[in-house]
Design a protein with these regions (language model features):
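Charge-dense, helix-prone N-terminal extensions
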Residues: 1-113
């Protein structure tokens, strides 16, 4: 059985699902948000994993105490993935620009394919 914070999901639904590029789905059984067919953002245990340009991911890992490398199911670290862990779900609103950057990054990658 997968564990995730349903309050986080409610806030992310509000933040993300108004964007016409974003659709909901699942990743390893966890709620996830896709841009086209590519995973952009997902809930995982007590946090939110997301894919970003490597430079942004590195900067957040160095400067933001709420971020850690995203390693779902014990997988190795990935240079473009981070996890944001917040206790209060409403605090994810402060990361709206980061979520938008993830969506744009995934969309641009698909345009280049």
């Amino acid at each position: 059985m997968v564990n995730f914070n349903r309050d986080h999901q409610a806030v992310l639904d509000e933040i993300l699902l108004e964007n016409p590029l974003v659709g909901s789905g699942k990743m390893f059984g966890y709620p996830a948000y896709y841009v086209g067919k590519k995973l952009s953002i997902c809930l995982y245990e007590e946090g939110v994993g997301l894919k970003l340009p490597a430079e942004t991911a590195t900067k957040l890992l160095e400067e933001d105490e709420n971020t850690i490398p995203f390693q779902p199911l014990g997988r190795p670290k990935m240079k473009e993935w981070i996890q944001i862990n917040l206790d209060d779900s409403k605090d994810y609103w402060q990361y709206t620009e980061v979520f938008e950057e993830s969506i744009q990054f995934i969309w641009e990658q698909q345009q280049q394919s």
